Regions:
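Residues on the lipid-exposed face of transmembrane beta-strands in outer-membrane beta-barrel proteins
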Residues: 1-4, 45-57, 71-73, 108-114, ...
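Start-of-domain marker
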Residues: 1-16, 27-32
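Membrane-embedded beta-strand positions of outer-membrane beta-barrel proteins
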Residues: 16-23, 67-71, 122-124
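Extracellular/periplasm-exposed beta-strand and loop segments of Gram-negative cell-envelope proteins
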Residues: 23-46, 76-105, 135-144, 182-202, ...
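Outer-membrane beta-barrel channels and translocator barrels
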Residues: 58-62, 115-119
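Hydrophobic core residues within well-ordered beta-strands of beta-rich domains
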Residues: 65-67, 106, 120
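Predominantly the C-terminal beta-signal and adjacent terminal strand-loop region
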Residues: 117-215
Length: 215
């Protein structure tokens, strides 16, 4: 579901919101790479739902460029494929906990969406995602509330920027939202439910490019 509207009483800034369900497949094979030595190939099926939002600059009647921040909740099934080399991976025991089972996780993404016409958009982004060993609901909820509160505090500051300098608002929103998300995910590299005591998750970082058709 996509919604665009003019923002902050200007004719050149829009508020872009995109809520979605998705199913994806990610694999080393898509990049034409094979595991060497202790390296491990993986193939991951993932589904979930998310929300993408941002403020953008109108370039015409329908065209716009939109720096965005996105957050998803998802479930992943990862199939780890070991190298044929006779070598032992020190993380093999941990990886076996995830192998070919569905696990809960979250991700955040920052990028730029270029809207050509109402029905066609191009995306380029950088995503950080984590897959939990176990879903400890109360610890996860506490960590999520801390992140949501921090994002809410940023919204107040960003609103002040828009009121004083609307043209700078979309860039400030993009930088601050994604900087906070990046920092939170760094803290979760060792504790998946930071700041609460919990195991380290599996983490994926990747660049993404895509095309979105709107019907």
């Amino acid at each position: 579901y996509i919604k665009d509207r003019n923002a902050w009483e200007t004719e050149y800034i829009i508020r872009h919101s995109y809520k979605y369900l998705y199913l994806s497949n990610e694999s080393n094979k898509l990049a034409g790479k094979e595991a060497v030595g202790t390296e491990i190939e993986s193939e991951m099926w993932r589904f979930g739902f998310g929300r993408l939002s941002g403020y953008g600059y109108k370039l015409g009647e329908s065209a716009a460029i939109i720096p965005y921040y996105s957050y998803t909740l998802n479930w992943s099934n990862i199939d780890f494929k070991k190298s044929t080399a006779e070598s032992v991976n020190p993380n093999e025991e941990i990886l076996n906990l995830y192998d070919e089972t569905f696990r809960f996780g979250t991700s955040s993404e920052g990028g730029v969406r270029i809207k050509i016409i109402d029905n066609l958009m191009f995306d380029a982004g950088y995503e950080r995602s984590i897959v939990f060993q176990r879903h400890l609901f109360w610890k996860w909820a506490g960590s999520a509330i801390i992140e949501a509160t921090a994002q809410g505090l940023l919204d107040g500051f960003i609103s002040e920027v828009f009121e004083s300098t609307p043209a700078a608002g979309p860039i400030v929103n993009f930088l601050l939202k994604n900087a906070l998300a990046y920092g939170i995910y760094e803290l979760r590299q060792d504790k998946m439910n930071w700041p609460f005591s919990s195991e380290a998750p599996i983490a994926y970082d990747q660049f993404k490019f895509g095309v979105t058709f709107v019907f």
